Each structure stands twice: as C-alpha cells, then as structure tokens.
C-alpha cells in the first residue's frame, strides 16, 4: 500500500485508523475530531492545479503517523466499508456517519449560530425595547381595563374621532384597552428576554472567561501589541509585582513573565445587568399571569371575605392562603380641608381568622398611599361612598313614631307572654327608639347630576293603586357632613348636619339626623411577581454601577537587565495612564552590579512556555 503523501514526515500502514469519505463530498467533522486534507504526491496547498483525488484523514489525540488511502470513486453499488463494523470507537451504531447525517447536523449548527447572532444583535434589542416603550406609552395615554361602554362613549366614531383616527372599536380590536396583558406585549417581552440571554451567552460570558485567563507574554513584540509599552532599564520584575500588589492587582509571575489584573467585577457587571433585566421581565410576566384583583365597597361595621372579591387574571393564577380570611370595617372617617373638600379618608380594618373562631389577627388604619398588607394580599384605600342615613322622629303622636311603637309593642308581647299588654309596652318605649336607618344610593352619572350625589327616600304613605309615586320625603347628601331635605312636592326644605341634634320640620314630621354611615372603597390585589420586579430593579442599579469599574491589565517581561512593561484598560484610560506612570516611577532602579546579576540570571533561566492567547 503506497501513500500519496505523508503527514509530519511519517507514514503508517494502519487501514483501521482511517475513515474514507467518498470522493467529492464536503469536508465535515465527525464526533468533534479534526480533519486534515492531504494532496497527491508533488502537490502543495498553494498549487492551482486541480487534483483528481482528495484524501481526508481523521487525526487522533496523539500525533501518530497516518496512512493516506486513495478514496474510491463513487459507484452505484453499496460500499463494503459502509457495511463494515466500526472500529474507531465513535459509537455510531456500527458504521460511519452518513454524509446526509453530517450535512443535517451541520445545517442545524449553522441555523443555531445564525439565530444566536440575530438575537444578540444590539440594533434589534434596541428596536424591541423601543417597541415596548411605545406600547407602554399607549397604555399610559389610553385608560386601561375600563368597560366596553367607556371606550365606545369616550372614543366615538365619525367626525369626533380622538386624534382623527382613534375610536373605541379600534381600541378594542387592537387590545389597546389592556395593553399590558395583550399577546403582542408578552411576545415583545419574550423577544427581549431571548435577546438578552443570547447576548450574555455569545458575548458577555466568553469575554469573562477570557479575562480570567493568566496570559503570560514571552516576547517583547507581544507586549507592543497590548497598547502602551515602556522599557525600564536596570529593573526587576519582582519589584514591579510587589508594587502592583500594593495597588490592588492580582499578580502572577512565571519565568520572568508577569501578568496582573484588577477590576474583574467590571467584566461581570454587564452579565449582572442582563440577569437583572431578565428578572424584571420574569416578574412582569408572572404578575400578568398570576395576579388576582378585585374591588369592594364595604359599609362601616360590616365585614367581607377576601376570596369573594379576588378575580384571577388567568387560569394559572392561584388563590393565596390568606384569601380565606375575613376583613371587618371597624370605622370609616374622612378629613376635610378648610374649603370643605375631602383631604384624606381612613379605614380602620381588622383581619379575622374564621378557622380560629373569628380571632383578630391584625388591625390597621389605612389611608391613601398607606395600604394594608398581609400574607401576600395588599389592600389599598381607593374610594369611598355613603351607605345609609340614620333619622330619628320626634314626638309620640307622629305617624311614623306610632308605627314604630306598635311594631315594638308587638315584638315585646310575643316574647313576654299573654299577661303583657301592648299599652304598657308602648308607654315604656323611649323616644330614641323611633329611628330609621335608610339606605342611600348613588346618583352619579345620572342625567342632570353633576359630581357625586347620594339619595334616599322616606315614604309617608303606601303607593297608589294606579301606580302613582308614593308621597314621601327626599333626602340627599354629597358628603357625610350635611344632609339636604326636600318635601313631597320636591321643594327645598333645609340642611342639617349629622349629630347636631337640631330637628327639621318636613311634611309635619320633626326629623333629626343622627348619623351618616360611610362605606370604604378598597382595592384588593395579590401580585406574586412584585418581589421579582423589585429584586430585578435593585440588582439593575447595583450591577450598572459595577459595570463601570475598569478592568485593567499589566504585562511585564524581564529581558536581561531591562524590564518591558505594557498595560491597557477598558475604561478610564487617562486615569489608567496616570496610575501606570506612578507604578513605573515607583519601581526602584538597580545599581549596575545588581543589574548585571539580574541579566545573568535572566539569561540562564529556562524559557517560559508560551501561553494561549
């Protein structure tokens, strides 16, 4: 068997160490091994002469001499080599990997590299961030999560279009009424997360791995390529290393070569920034899919269960364990400014545990911007309302008073037995028992009503059989400070303050406003993504500062009595130049006799192996 060429000047006659690839097929890598192309006898790699035969060899981990076999011409008959069992240890099922498999594997690798390159592109990442910023701006301009009627009324079609094109139908079609939970918003965040991950994997992390290597330079010309280079006559590399250690450098010395660096955290900073941004994106997505929200208007003195008002934003949202607790509204109060407008409103709330018989677990008075947080649920003070008005009727002869007395007498007679008389019970009724608690309803948004207004009605007679409205007193209030009375004809009668004790005569009745019961408007929210978002923003601030740290490197090479020193940095280059000047000025200059000793020792020292650059 005659070889066509030799590799490294040696040849082998081991046909089992060779995989023959059919002529004309592209050169591929099998199982990560390297291939070498050998040419026919007399040919050189630079020759332009077209070769008829191409031999491809598989090299092992050691440099043995290899036989070069002539590749057979492709034929229609199956090759005996293809059917022969493999002895190469590749573990490919007893045969050589087919060219089709190699091409498919290479195509996947090429596609993966192209995908990573596209995702890690800085212009594309900026474009995705700009898209998210535009969508967020639209979400700020267009009110979110309102009713369909709201958008149809406030963004009408026709000549009154907002901005000339924005209509309610367009907003609903493009999901602009809930941008932050729209499909395209989540898709944009997913693309940004993929771009950050690809950039970290393909660019930032390899840069950190390179920065961690000890890179010794053994030739003066290698130092010249690193940037600024200085030559110190009569100097020792050990003295330079000691000074660098004092300056906070990590120093490594080997056979007259020195490598020192500091500020490696600056290389890790961009990775931390990307990780913090990914954490923010994850928290945002988790909030979108896992949030539970709800609103409740609870009157003073009443309670409600948290789980009854929490609505999940998606099927994967889970109810927190604290949702089974009960909230009791102890007191609701409002502070007013001197002009009578509302300054602040407060709700005194108690958290009760039904599993422990309604035991009070927590209690807090909340207000606007001071929420109530408990076990993953946050309760905000967002609104208020008027729930009821309590009136007292003066005089035992008033019809309403007599009706109330009769009802009390009937209840007392049914509980005290047959010997009790209604008259005696009626005589014992105190005057303050003839009181009425009338519920109030909001008239806000009704025709002819401006602002917030609550109303109730005190009937004085049964409704007529003809369907006519019953005779009664209309009672209105805009806030808990004052109550307005109108008679049966709709004529204004007067205004009274709750708790003043001053009666007002309406339709022959003397009425006293005892109290106006308020209702607190609370927004309930359980957002599991908030901790991740806060942690991401905190990490983003810290890692952004870290990324501004300079990564500085210094190389030195002892050549006789001369010391070659080079250095570079990625930031604050002027400051690094000044620092390097101070370091070089601090290196002591040796006397001639000591310099001669250093030169002789350097000349007898073994040459240092060249490190991988």
Swiss-Prot record:
The chain crosses the membrane at residues 122-142, 179-199, 269-289. Residues 143-178, 290-613 are lumenal. Residues 63-86, 409-429 are annotated as: Disordered. One of its GO terms (cellular component) is chloroplast thylakoid membrane. Disulfide bonds: none annotated. Changing residue 274 to A: Abrogates production of c-type holocytochrome; about 5% CCS1 protein accumulates. Belongs to the Ccs1/CcsB family. May interact with ccsA. This is Cytochrome c biogenesis protein CCS1, chloroplastic. It comes from Chlamydomonas reinhardtii (Chlamydomonas smithii).
């Amino acid at each position: 068997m005659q070889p066509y060429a030799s590799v490294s000047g040696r040849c082998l006659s081991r046909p089992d160490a060779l995989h023959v690839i059919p002529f004309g097929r592209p050169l591929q890598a099998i199982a990560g091994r390297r291939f070498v192309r050998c040419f026919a006898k007399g040919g050189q790699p630079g020759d332009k002469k077209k070769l008829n035969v191409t031999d491809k060899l598989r090299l092992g981990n050691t440099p043995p001499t290899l036989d070069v076999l002539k590749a057979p011409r492709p034929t229609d008959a199956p090759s005996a080599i293809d059917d022969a069992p493999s002895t190469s240890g590749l573990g490919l099922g007893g045969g050589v990997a087919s060219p089709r498999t190699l091409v498919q594997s290479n195509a996947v690798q090429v596609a993966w590299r192209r995908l990573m390159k596209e995702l890690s592109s800085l212009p594309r990442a900026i474009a995705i961030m700009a898209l998210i910023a535009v969508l967020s701006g639209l979400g700020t301009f267009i009110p979110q999560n309102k009713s369909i009627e709201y958008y149809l009324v406030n963004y009408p079609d026709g000549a009154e279009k907002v901005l000339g094109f924005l209509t309610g139908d367009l907003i609903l079609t493009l999901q602009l009424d809930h941008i932050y939970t729209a499909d395209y918003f989540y898709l944009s965040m997913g693309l940004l997360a993929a771009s950050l991950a690809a950039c970290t994997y393909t660019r930032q992390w390899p840069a950190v791995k390179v920065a961690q290597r000890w890179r010794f330079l053994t030739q003066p010309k290698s130092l010249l390529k690193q940037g600024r280079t200085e030559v110190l006559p009569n100097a020792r590399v050990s003295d330079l290393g000691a000074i660098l250690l004092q300056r906070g450098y990590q120093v490594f010395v080997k056979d007259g070569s020195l490598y020192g660096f500091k500020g490696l955290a600056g290389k890790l900073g961009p990775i931390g920034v990307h990780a913090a941004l990914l954490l923010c994106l994850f928290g945002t997505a988790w909030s979108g899919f896992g949030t539970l929200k709800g609103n409740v208007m609870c009157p003073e003195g009443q309670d409600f269960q948290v789980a009854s008002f929490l609505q999940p934003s998606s099927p994967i949202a889970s109810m927190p364990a604290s949702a089974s607790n009960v909230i009791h509204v102890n007191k609701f109060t409002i502070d007013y400014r001197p002009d009578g407008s509302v300054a602040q409103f407060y709700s005194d709330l108690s958290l009760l545990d039904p599993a422990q018989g309604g035991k009070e677990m927590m209690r807090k008075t909340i207000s606007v911007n001071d929420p109530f947080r408990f076990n993953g649920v946050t309760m905000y003070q967002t609104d208020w309302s008027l729930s009821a008005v309590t009136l007292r009727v003066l005089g035992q002869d008033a019809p309403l008073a007599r009706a109330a007395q009769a009802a009390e007498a009937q209840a007392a007679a049914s509980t005290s037995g047959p010997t009790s008389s209604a008259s005696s019970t009626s005589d014992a009724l105190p005057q303050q028992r003839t009181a009425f608690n009338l519920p109030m309803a909001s008239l806000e948004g009704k025709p002819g009503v401006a602002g917030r207004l609550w109303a109730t009605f005190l009937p004085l007679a049964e409704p007529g059989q003809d369907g006519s409205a019953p005779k009664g007193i209309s009672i209105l209030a805009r806030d808990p400070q004052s109550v307005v009375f109108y008679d049966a004809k709709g004529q204004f009668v007067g205004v009274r303050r709750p708790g003043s004790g001053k009666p007002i005569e309406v339709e022959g009745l003397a009425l006293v406003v005892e109290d106006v019961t308020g209702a607190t408007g609370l927004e309930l929210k359980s957002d599991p993504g908030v901790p991740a978002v806060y942690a991401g923003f905190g990490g983003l601030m810290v890692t952004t500062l870290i990324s501004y740290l300079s990564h500085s490197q210094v190389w030195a090479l002892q050549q006789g009595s001369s010391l070659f020193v080079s250095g570079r940095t990625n930031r604050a280059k002027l400051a690094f130049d000044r620092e390097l000047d101070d370091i070089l000025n601090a290196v002591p200059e040796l006397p001639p006799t000591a310099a001669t000793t250093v030169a002789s020792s350097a000349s007898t020292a073994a040459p240092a192996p060249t490190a991988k650059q």
